[in-house]
């Protein structure tokens, strides 16, 4: 193509050395040169187009190391059941009812975003509550964590869920005082409502794979892609890929609609299939690539299913839950490591994190790989001594700062004072661990600048602050966590995450310099343009 462009006229943050430059020269989809305007003009040639930033800030496109894009698109199409509009049970029922009134007579009503701590009743809705919306059709609301679904009586009946239905391995059917199902399904129990042809996660993770028509799933994925790109996110890791996601990504790519760069971690139910295929390392292209294996150790802090042998504040005998017996999880991680795969294991509670660290240690004793880059997804509540072990083993924690903004107050209620160590970024930095930040969208929104603000301030939705100054990180450290460190966590640092010659020209233009504005104004910094492959994104073709 020989498309040559020079971008200049505002602060340019490279996330590499030197940290700031005057200009960037692009050749087609790649960065040709960074440095002075004179040098970039010389590198690009006299016929190069020149783009004036007009004082705005240029930096690398954001890299979100933990997302669920198809789930984001699907949940965005459902009823938004989160604050500030929904803070009471009556408001939830009323809003779901409005959606019901606009649907065909038997179409299901789905919602997303409920958290018990946000409702006036301080509990999750149960079947009797959702029966107020409808009894002649399915009504279902996914918990904000993605690890639970609340359903009405019709959904329970349609799927044969009764008092005699046992809890599946890795899941739980909440029951009332008589033993009947209450209508709240956790983790692998969501398998029970995805139908005979739907994805089954078994005891390998929460079932976020709600069925829909294939062509509809492509549209939902493309809608999510637009949301991410408009937030300045150009590369993501999809942290739970099954055949549903794979088929949808392939369809979007084949239709020429995939602009986002996606690294896929396939769910551990597929480990033996990967071994049988011999798929031991990265496979794909610059926009869609297989990256490794996703596993689950425990549940979620927001759903009170994260695993702590010491229990929770409200009940020291309530420990949360594990998806696998410890030896089974360690075996899966050892097998994936021996085969050559990078793993990302969901672990929130310190007791679950201990199982993962032991598994990685055993795997390295078996086959020494110095650059394994095994990850712990979320890694919200490691014990203080585990931080050093994480550094020693070379494990990468992948955190989501917006989570402590959304649910930090509820965590203090559930865990007590130890919740102030949630997402211990300061401890990570002092141990030599570079923070990797992400959104886990749709659990939180896809806005990286809100996440940066949350990581720097540790402020919650209700205005309290988690931890002291020692747990905070700088704006620059947080920005690196959403660019070059996010790229490194998914083995893409050779291609994205910083402005360096030879890398892909994925750029974001911001209204202001995030390193110069007051910290309290970080969330107000706007993404004004997103570039992929050396040109502004053409949203009309997506």
Q: Where are the regions a protein language model picked out?
A:
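Divalent metal-binding segments
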Residues: 2-8, 13-276, 295, 300-335, ...
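Short glycine-rich, flexible loops that bind phosphorylated cofactors or substrates
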Residues: 118, 158, 405-406, 517
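Short proline/glycine-enriched turn/loop segments at secondary-structure junctions
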Residues: 281-282, 517-522
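Short peripheral tails and domain-boundary helices/loops at the edges of structured domains
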Residues: 527-542
């Amino acid at each position: 193509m020989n498309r040559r462009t020079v971008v200049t006229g505002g602060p340019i943050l490279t996330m590499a050395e030197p940290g700031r430059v005057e200009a960037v020269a692009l050749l087609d989809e790649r960065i040709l040169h960074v440095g002075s305007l004179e040098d970039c003009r010389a590198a690009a040639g006299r016929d190069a187009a020149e783009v004036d930033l007009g004082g705005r800030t240029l930096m690398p496109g954001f890299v979100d190391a933990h997302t669920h894009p198809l789930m984001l698109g699907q949940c965005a199409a459902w009823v938004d059941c989160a604050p500030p509009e929904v803070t009471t049970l009556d408001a939830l029922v009323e809003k779901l009812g409005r959606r019901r009134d606009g649907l065909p007579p038997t179409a299901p009503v789905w919602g997303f975003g409920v958290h018990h701590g946000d409702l006036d009743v301080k509990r999750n809705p149960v079947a009797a509550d959702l029966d107020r919306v409808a009894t002649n059709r399915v009504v279902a609301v996914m918990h904000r964590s993605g690890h639970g679904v609340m359903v009405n009586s019709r959904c329970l009946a349609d799927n044969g869920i009764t008092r005699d239905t046992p809890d599946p391995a890795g899941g739980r059917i909440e029951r009332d005082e008589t033993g009947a199902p209450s209508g709240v399904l956790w983790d692998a129990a969501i398998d029970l409502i995805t139908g005979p042809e739907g994805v089954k996660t078994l005891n390998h993770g929460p079932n976020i794979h709600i069925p829909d028509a294939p062509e509809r799933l492509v549209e939902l994925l493309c809608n999510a892609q637009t949301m991410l790109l408009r937030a300045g996110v150009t590369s993501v890791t999809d942290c739970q890929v099954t055949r549903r996601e794979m088929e949808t990504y392939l369809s979007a790519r084949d239709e020429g609609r995939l602009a986002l760069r996606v690294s896929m971690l396939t769910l551990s139910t597929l480990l033996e299939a990967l071994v049988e295929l011999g798929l031991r390392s990265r496979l794909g292209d610059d926009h869609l690539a297989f990256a490794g294996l996703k596993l689950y150790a425990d549940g979620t802090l927001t759903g009170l299913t994260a695993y702590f042998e010491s229990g929770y504040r409200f009940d020291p005998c309530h420990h949360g839950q594990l998806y696998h017996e410890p030896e089974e999880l360690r075996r899966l991680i050892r097998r994936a490591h021996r085969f050559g795969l990078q793993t990302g294991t969901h672990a929130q509670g310190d007791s679950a994190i201990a199982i993962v660290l032991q598994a990685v240690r055993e795997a390295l004793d078996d086959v020494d790989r110095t650059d394994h880059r095994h990850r712990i997804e979320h890694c919200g509540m490691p014990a203080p001594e585990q931080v050093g072990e994480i550094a020693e083993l070379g494990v990468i924690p992948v955190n989501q700062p917006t989570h402590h903004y959304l649910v930090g107050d509820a965590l203090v209620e559930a865990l007590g004072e130890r919740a102030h160590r949630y997402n211990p970024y300061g401890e990570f930095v002092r141990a030599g661990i570079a923070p990797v930040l992400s959104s886990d969208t749709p659990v939180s929104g896809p806005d990286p600048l809100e996440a940066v603000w949350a990581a720097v301030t540790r402020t919650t939705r209700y205005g309290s602050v988690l931890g002291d100054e020692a747990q905070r990180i700088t704006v620059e450290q947080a920005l690196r966590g959403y660019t070059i460190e996010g790229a490194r966590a998914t083995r893409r640092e050779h291609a994205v995450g910083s402005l360096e010659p030879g890398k892909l020209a994925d750029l974001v233009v911001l209204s202001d310099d995030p390193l110069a504005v007051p910290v309290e104004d970080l969330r107000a910094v706007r993404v004004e343009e997103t570039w992929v492959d050396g040109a502004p994104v053409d949203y009309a073709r997506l």
